[in-house]
Amino acid sequence: MQQEKELVKQKAKELLLDLLSIYTPSKNETNATKFFEKISNEFNLKLEILPDSNSFILGEGEILLASHVDTVPGYIEPKIENEVIYGRGAVDAKGPLISMIIAAWLLNEKGIKVMVSGLADEESTSIGAKELTLKNFNFKHIIVGEPSNGTDIVVEYRGSIQLDIMCESTPEHSSSAKSNLIVDISKKIIEVYKQPENYDKPSIVPTIIRAGESYNVTPAKLYLHFDVRYAINNKRDDLINEIKDKFQECGLKIVDETPPVKVSINNPVVKSLTRALLKQNIKPRLVRKAGTSDMNILQKITTSIATYGPGNSMLEHTNQEKITFDEIYIGVKTYMLAIEELWQKS
């Protein structure tokens, strides 16, 4: 047991340091191609690169370990100090991804066939997960790798709607203008705005507004973007119609949309992850998340799915991203124990 732990931690140091050294903000995932080619050769895992998204698929099988290789922007020089590794993506989600790669390698060595994916664009519009759903892939089980503190199993995510609104008006000299597009639209924003308060209540949040071209002329055009979040028990169409009714004189376009997801606590992946943690004397928690993940998309190609991963979720997207190699080991062990159970019952 101790020998296996040291092997996993040593391999994690090597692989995670390599991957953190490669800058892969969304849409730049091809930077990691040589890394995945090396993994494929070293671990004897077949490599497929999805052509449209540049997502990486390793191995074969009916069970998928799915994480993502892209990060938010902002490179952080990786370093290791006292069994802690720092760098952009250490938590979200290169740490979970490396845990999955090591788990897949060890499982395949035991004859348990598992696929692992480093999907693209999760931090943007999830084109990697979307491409996977369009390629006729279907899996008996999927575990999504996102930081969940090494103890939490995510069974629910909210959905999102990204809305662009374009408004127009007659420009006037600002010294004598009778109307102002900025003022008029600002009033409507305040009326439709729903502050994020709790999970079950939807939020409608303006995130971008652009208008005006001259210091002394009221704007002729205004661009506005809303980020809408809603739980599975909220009515999507009601939210869209509420915004449409408020901005009747403007054009509205849905530029991206992700459905909410909620899975039964009795689905096989949830139960196997729960038992895997209990076997390590770790008390699992079933949680729901206010954001979205690739789980929202990948629910289309399986009936058994949940999200779990090592890493402190409070450090996601911060300049303090770090993860310990003990956390990585717990992640590897949890994935392996869960998949061994799922494999035996298949």
UniProtKB/Swiss-Prot annotation:
Q: Which cysteines are joined by disulfide bonds?
A: none
Recorded protein name is [LysW]-lysine/[LysW]-ornithine hydrolase
EC numbers, comma separated: 3.5.1.130, 3.5.1.132
Enzyme class, spelled out: hydrolase
Record-annotated residues binding Zn(2+) 2?
92, 123, 317
| Location, primary (coarse class) | cytoplasm
Source organism per entry reads Saccharolobus islandicus (strain M.16.27) (Sulfolobus islandicus)
Keywords of the record: Amino-acid biosynthesis, Arginine biosynthesis, Cobalt, Cytoplasm, Hydrolase, Lysine biosynthesis, Metal-binding, Zinc
Bound how, and how many: what does the cofactor note say? Binds 2 Zn(2+) or Co(2+) ions per subunit.
Q: Which Pfam families match?
A: M20_dimer, Peptidase_M20
Gene name on record?
Answer: lysK
Task: State a GO cellular component annotated for this protein.
Answer: cytoplasm
- Binding sites annotated in the UniProt record for Zn(2+) 1: 68, 92, 146
The pathway noted for it is: Amino-acid biosynthesis; L-lysine biosynthesis via AAA pathway; L-lysine from L-alpha-aminoadipate (Thermus route): step 5/5; Amino-acid biosynthesis; L-arginine biosynthesis
Kindly state a single biological-process term from the GO annotations of this entry: L-arginine biosynthetic process
The record's subcellular locations are: Cytoplasm
Molecular function (GO) terms for this protein are: cobalt ion binding; hydrolase activity, acting on carbon-nitrogen (but not peptide) bonds, in linear amides; zinc ion binding
Reactions the enzyme catalyzes: [amino-group carrier protein]-C-terminal-gamma-(L-lysyl)-L-glutamate + H2O = [amino-group carrier protein]-C-terminal-L-glutamate + L-lysine; [amino-group carrier protein]-C-terminal-gamma-(L-ornithyl)-L-glutamate + H2O = [amino-group carrier protein]-C-terminal-L-glutamate + L-ornithine
Similarity remark: Belongs to the peptidase M20A family. LysK subfamily.
Task: Tell me which cofactor or cofactors this protein depends on.
Answer: Zn(2+); Co(2+)
Locate the active site.
Answer: 70, 122 (proton acceptor)
- Function according to Swiss-Prot or TrEMBL: Catalyzes the release of L-lysine from [LysW]-gamma-L-lysine and the release of L-ornithine from [LysW]-L-ornithine.
